[in-house]
Amino acid sequence: MIDEALFEAEEKMEKAVTVAKDDLGSIRTGRANPGMFNRIGIDYYGAFTPITQLASINVPEARLVVVKPYEASQLGAIETAIRNSDLGVNPSNDGNLIRISVPQLTEERRRELVKQAKSKGEDAKVSVRNVRRKAMDELSRIQKDGEAGEDEVGRAEKELDKTTARYVAQVDELVKHKEAELLEV
């Protein structure tokens, strides 16, 4: 029971870190990057579909992204979704594909994005800590029900604390890396 609780907690913490990676990857830096478009989608036959599944996204130059829809009929919808996103870019449609010139970030916008990255990192750490709290509750329940002794539960709690610290450190590292990437001119 204890091993199951620890394994489940670690799995959930891993998912929280993965979500944090995705969230931080969607924050645009001064360079063109296909990951910028992971969170942008359109209504495609009644279902929200990310544009990464509807088009090929290439980066031929450091500040240029080319989006080529698999279906020409989706060109306008994809262009509108990109324009309405919070990326702050202005796509140009030539009838076959969409070109997006990624402008240089202003100092003010960089600081805004760093705050956003820190906020997303803090959300991920809260998520990891919530998983820890639920696992601790589960360990207490196991001890109370007499399924494990106090020593076993104590060791499991120490192991859980180490695991939590490891995942919180991973999130901190991701945020630090993103911050350095954003502040790099």
Swiss-Prot record:
Region annotated Disordered, chain positions: 141-160
GO biological process: translational termination
SUPFAM superfamilies associated with the record: Ribosome recycling factor, RRF (SSF55194)
Entry-linked Pfam families: RRF (PF01765)
One function term, GO molecular function aspect: ribosomal large subunit binding
Main localization of the protein described in the UniProt heading: cytoplasm
Statement: the UniProt record of this protein carries the keyword Phosphoprotein: no
Compartment(s) where it occurs, according to its Swiss-Prot or TrEMBL record: Cytoplasm
Keyword vocabulary terms for this entry: Cytoplasm, Protein biosynthesis
Gene Ontology cellular component list: cytoplasm
Family the UniProt entry places it in: Belongs to the RRF family.
NCBIfam families, A to Z: frr (TIGR00496)
General function of this protein: Responsible for the release of ribosomes from messenger RNA at the termination of protein biosynthesis. May increase the efficiency of translation by recycling ribosomes from one round of translation to another.
Stated name of the protein: Ribosome-recycling factor
Organism: Rhodococcus jostii (strain RHA1)
